[in-house]
C-alpha cells in the first residue's frame, strides 16, 4: 500500500462521475469517526487504480459512468480482489436491474435517494462482511419473489399437486420482534421502524440483532426472504 492510512478505521473509496455527489457523500461519511475516505475517482478505470493503490475496505460505486461503467468495474474488481466489498450506488430500483448488478458480486445496493443514516449503516454492514439492500429495493425484490412463488403454486395446483402449506409464524420471536420483522418486510429502515413503534433506533437495532440470531441468518435481507418463503409475514 503506497499511502499512509489509518488501519483502525474503515477505509473507503468513492467512485462517481459527479464531483458534487462525491463531495456530498464525503461530508456525510466524515460525520462518522469510524470512517476514512482515502480517495475518490470519476469512473471504473479509476476504481481499479485506486483499489490497487489504497486497498480500501469498502468501495462506493456508481453505475452509470463514462469509459468503464460500475457494473464492469465491480465485476473486474471482484475477480481480482475477491475480498473487496463493493456497495453500489444507483438511481435504479427495478428488481431486474438490481439482480443483474448483484450478480457481479457486489455486497450491497443503495439508492442515491438514501439519507445519511442509511448510507452510514450500509457502509458498516458491508465492511463487516454483511449484505445491505436499500429498503425500497428490498420491497420490490420481495414483491417480485412473491409473484414468482404464487405463479409456481398456481402451476403446481393445476397439475394436481397440493399447494404448499406455510408454517405458522416463528414462535421463538417475541411480539415486538414480530412487529419489527413485519416492518422490515415492508421496507422500513431502522429509523422508520423506531418512529412507527415509538421506540429508539438503538432498541430497533437490538431487536433486529435478536431476530437475526434466532433465525440463524446473517443479515436483514436473508431474514425477510426467509420469512416470506415460510409465510411468517405479509407482503403488503
Curated annotation (Swiss-Prot):
GO molecular function terms listed in the Swiss-Prot or TrEMBL record: DNA binding
GO cellular component: cytoplasm
Domain Response regulatory: 11-127
Keywords: Activator, Cytoplasm, DNA-binding, Phosphoprotein, Repressor, Transcription, Transcription regulation, Two-component regulatory system
Statement: the UniProt record of this protein carries the keyword DNA-binding: yes
Domain of life: Bacteria
PROSITE patterns found in the cross-reference section: HTH_LUXR_1, HTH_LUXR_2, RESPONSE_REGULATORY
Post-translational modifications reported in the UniProt record: Phosphorylated and dephosphorylated by DegS.
GO BP terms in the entry: phosphorelay signal transduction system; regulation of DNA-templated transcription
InterPro entries per the UniProt record, alphabetical: CheY-like_superfamily, Sig_transdc_resp-reg_C-effctor, Sig_transdc_resp-reg_receiver, Tscrpt_reg_LuxR_C, WalR-like
Pfam families for this protein: GerE, Response_reg
Signal peptide: none
Function: Member of the two-component regulatory system DegS/DegU, which plays an important role in the transition growth phase.
Full protein name: Transcriptional regulatory protein DegU
GN (gene name): degU
